[in-house]
Swiss-Prot record:
The keyword Kinase does not apply. NCBIfam families: one_C_dehyd_B. GO terms for biological process: methanogenesis, from carbon dioxide; respiratory electron transport chain. Its cofactor is W-bis(molybdopterin guanine dinucleotide). It is an enzyme of class 1 (oxidoreductase). It comes from Methanococcus maripaludis (strain DSM 14266 / JCM 13030 / NBRC 101832 / S2 / LL). This is Tungsten-containing formylmethanofuran dehydrogenase 2 subunit B. The lineage of its organism: Archaea, Methanobacteriati, Methanobacteriota, Methanomada group, Methanococci. Gene3D superfamilies: 3.40.50.740, Dimethylsulfoxide Reductase, domain 2 (3.40.228.10). The keyword tRNA-binding does not apply. Its EC number is 1.2.7.12. Pfam families: Molybdopterin (PF00384). Keywords: Methanogenesis, Oxidoreductase, Selenocysteine, Tungsten. It comes from the Archaea.
Length: 434
């Protein structure tokens, strides 16, 4: 049995890089240090329905037929070239080189390229563009933070090692006693497992986050809040939370989809960032979005470097345009604008609204995914890639914007191509057809 040390876990945005993977006869038989979700990521592909070769069918009611990569990519390229407005969506579980090639493919085919941020942390990116990004690395939080604030976030379930590795429990350079040296504030409508560990739980009413942030900012600036409670939180608790934040040596605010998908969307995050800026008049305070997929941040970084825009980039006029609400994947699907779609390293069929999925079922759909998913079931073509972070190396961006190299621990099935190799084939075929 071979033990691979310091392997990066390709599941969530925490990108834990201390995993040990146990390999026997080119099969993963176990892991060490990984959380339950990370362990399942390394182990589940053994039991999941995995596509061994590309599949094709003309009619979605027919059965799939096995073909080779050459045939499948040629048909995909033909569909791309003939489409009036193709959509290339996903990318959050692919490595950065494949993402960069995907943006190039979208440019060549005058497509819309979008990633899963448009249905999760898209509002965060809009807010950052509006008012700034007072961010730090997770290492700084671990070593310096004595106040940690989780807003609309439940890392105990969503990012299980976040609190133990970076934010609350670890012993840092200036926080030698770990949790004893830190105070923890949680803002959540429910008494989550994370909230149960908090020193202060601000149990905000659903969709009242904007009011609560505004009250925190007012209290921080010395205004007298006349109401007995704001957004369901007692005024005295608001003042207590603000005092803790003001007196911190280093404060760190982590926010997740509880905020981005609350009523007000990016305007709430605008306000939260302004609260962090206000706090910097008294102490050092930073914020970090709790990104979900392990490389959702990577696509936003790559797309911004290449096109100037983080997601929902429309190349239909030959140059990049960006207008979330018009050019994002859900918008074009629900309006019925797109006439061909490629789903890459994500599962739109499982997570998009019914109206969007109904349109996906009507149009030619290509799925680039190693396993059977609700998206692949309604596809015309399935192009299975090798699994990044397990069978292929590459680069991914952690939630705080730190790039980390993913490792290869086992060999991919014979003849299986990586996401980047599939993209290269598609670009070559498109160039030949144009």
């Amino acid at each position: 049995m071979e033990v691979f040390k310091n392997v990066v876990c390709p599941f969530c945005g925490t990108l834990c890089d201390d995993i040990e993977v146990l390999v026997e006869n080119n099969h993963v038989v176990g892991t060490r240090n990984a959380c339950r979700i990370g362990n399942a990521k390394f182990m589940h592909f053994e039991g999941a329905i995995r596509h061994e070769s590309p599949l094709m069918r003309e009619n979605k009611k027919d059965d799939f037929k096995k073909v080779d990569y050459e045939t499948a990519t040629e048909e995909t390229a033909r569909l791309l070239v003939e489409a009036k407005l193709p959509l290339i969506y996903g990318w959050s579980s692919a490595e950065c080189h494949a993402q960069q090639l995907g943006v190039l493919l979208a440019e060549k085919t005058k497509a819309i390229v979008d990633n899963t941020a448009s249905v999760u942390h898209g509002p965060s990116l809009l807010a950052v563009q509006d008012v700034g990004y007072p961010v730090s690395t997770l290492g700084e939080t671990k070593n310096r933070a004595d106040v940690v604030l989780f807003w609309g976030s439940n890392p105990m379930h969503a990012h299980p090692r976040h609190m133990s590795r970076y934010s609350v429990f670890p012993r840092g350079f200036f926080r030698q006693r770990g949790k004893q040296d830190r105070q923890m504030i949680v803002v959540d409508p429910r008494k989550t497992d994370t909230a149960k560990l908090a020193d202060i739980h601000l149990q905000v009413e659903p969709h009242k986050d904007y009011e609560l942030v505004s009250a925190l900012r007012a209290a921080a600036k010395g205004f007298n809040i006349e109401a007995e409670q704001v957004a369901g939180v007692p005024t005295e608790t608001i003042y207590e939370a603000v005092d803790i934040c003001k007196n911190a040596q280093f404060g760190s605010l982590f926010f997740a989809m509880g905020v981005t998908m609350s009523r007000g969307k990016h305007r709430i995050i605008d306000n939260a960032i302004q609260f962090v800026i206000d706090m910097n008049a008294y102490t050092k305070f930073v914020l970090t979005p709790m990104r979900g997929h392990y490389n959702v941040n990577g696509f936003n970084q790559v797309s911004t470097w290449v096109t100037g825009y983080p997601y929902g980039v429309d190349f239909s006029r030959g140059y990049p345009r960006y207008n979330p609400g018009e050019t994002a994947s859900n918008d074009v699907l629900q309006r019925g604008d797109t006439d061909m779609m490629i789903n890459v390293a994500s599962d739109a069929g499982a997570h998009f609204p019914q109206k969007a999925v109904q349109h996906m079922a009507k149009i030619p759909l290509v799925c680039i995914d190693p396993h059977e998913t609700p998206s692949s079931v309604i596809s015309n073509i399935v192009l299975p890639p090798a699994i990044t972070g397990l069978e292929v190396s590459g680069t991914a961006y952690r939630m705080d914007g730190v790039p980390i190299e993913l490792r290869k621990v086992i060999k991919a099935p014979e003849g299986m191509l990586s996401d980047a190799e599939i993209m290269k084939m598609l670009i070559k075929k498109v160039d030949e057809m144009k």
